[in-house]
Amino acid sequence: DQCTYCGIYCCPPKFCTSSGCRSP
């Protein structure tokens, strides 16, 4: 997978923002 970490893990299709995970 291509999960990214920004305080919590976000996996596609979600993505990291300054406030955490966000849906597309």
From Swiss-Prot:
Please list the tissues where expression of this protein has been recorded. Expressed by the venom duct.
- What are the GO MF terms of this UniProt record? toxin activity
Summarize what the UniProt record says about post-translational modification: The three Pro-12, Pro-13 and Pro-24 were found to be not hydroxylated.
Disulfide pairings: 3-11, 6-16, 10-21
Q: Its GO CC terms?
A: extracellular region
Location in the cell reads: Secreted
The entry's keywords? Disulfide bond, Secreted, Toxin
Domain comment (free text):
The cysteine framework is VI/VII (C-C-CC-C-C). Displays a mini-granulin fold, a structure composed of two short, stacked beta-hairpins connected by two parallel disulfide bonds. This newly described fold is derived from the same cysteine connectivity as knottins (ICK fold). The name 'mini-granulin fold' comes from the structural homology with the N-terminal region of the human granulin.
State the name under which the record lists this protein: Conotoxin pr6c
